[in-house]
Regions:
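Conserved PLP-anchoring active-site segment centered on the Schiff-base-forming lysine
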Residues: 20-42
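Helix C-cap/helix->beta junction micro-motif
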Residues: 45, 105-106, 136
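Active-site PLP attachment segment
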Residues: 132-169
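Active-site phosphate-binding strand-loop segment of PLP-dependent enzymes
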Residues: 55-124
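Conserved glycine-rich beta-strand-loop-beta hairpin in the small C-terminal domain of fold type I
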Residues: 190, 206-215, 226-235
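Phosphate-binding glycine-rich loop
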Residues: 1-27
């Protein structure tokens, strides 16, 4: 339990993590496009967001070379969301390994937002960057929650996994802010985990059906193009 914290949603995990690790002026690399709150959370924690433009030819995924180019002596962390909101793309094991190598070499923390981990289609596999070896695991703050997988957005339940010293800092900050998720929410989360199986499979099936239907309609509009969504529920 020294490496786990439970809180009021993945958003809370991200915010508390940034408040824990950042000193004023520290930089955080954020690939673009990104979830709207990333940059604002960094600013609220006293940090400086460094937004990296990505290329549609690479499905808007940041490369190791782009990450290297964004690193300065003030870089503290990189925020990595895969599966990606808002593009629906998925980083491969090879792409993640390349980013992990850069992070470890530069001793940069990776804040891995994996909230859409179950929403992966067409036989693709979601790989967690923290699973790629002990070195990158020790440099990763993994964030997840119940809002997407279990359709529990309003319940506000999330968690983070990280080295014990980071989690200890997060617990101190959380103790003076939200304290903890409500007891009712925690019991609901236990039930969700225990009954995951077919319920989650059905949720994924429904979203996959919607995804295919949307793509079929978009394919009929010659003036529009899109990046093929391997994951999430965005195009």
């Amino acid at each position: 339990m020294d490496e786990i914290i439970v809180n009021s949603g993945a958003k809370s995990s991200l915010s508390v993590a940034l408040q824990t690790i950042l000193n004023p002026g520290d930089e955080v690399i954020i690939p673009k496009p990104y979830w709207v709150s990333y940059t604002e959370m960094v600013k609220l924690a006293g940090g400086v967001p460094v937004v990296v433009d990505t290329d549609p030819e690479n499905a808007f995924k940041m490369t190791a070379e782009q990450m290297k180019a964004a690193i300065t002596d003030k870089t503290k962390a990189m925020m990595l969301n895969t599966p990606v909101n808002p593009t629906g793309v998925l980083y491969s094991r090879e792409e993640l390994q390349a980013l992990a190598d850069v992070a470890v070499a530069a001793d940069i923390l990776v804040i891995a937002d994996e909230i859409y981990e179950e929403f992966v289609y067409d036989g693709n596999k979601m790989v967690s960057i923290a699973s790629l070896g002990e070195a990158i695991k020790n440099n990763t703050i993994l964030v997840n929650g119940f809002s997407k997988t279990y359709a529990m957005t309003g319940w506000r339940l999330g968690y983070a996994a990280a080295p014990a010293d980071i989690i200890a800092g997060m617990k101190r900050i959380q103790g003076h802010t939200i304290s903890h998720p409500s007891t009712i929410t925690q019991y609901a989360g236990i039930t969700a985990l225990e009954e995951k199986g077919e319920v989650v499979n059905e949720i994924i099936r429904i979203f996959d059906e919607r995804r295919r239907g949307m793509m079929a309609r978009l394919d009929k509009i010659s003036q529009l193009s899109y990046i093929y969504p391997q994951s999430t529920f965005y195009i």
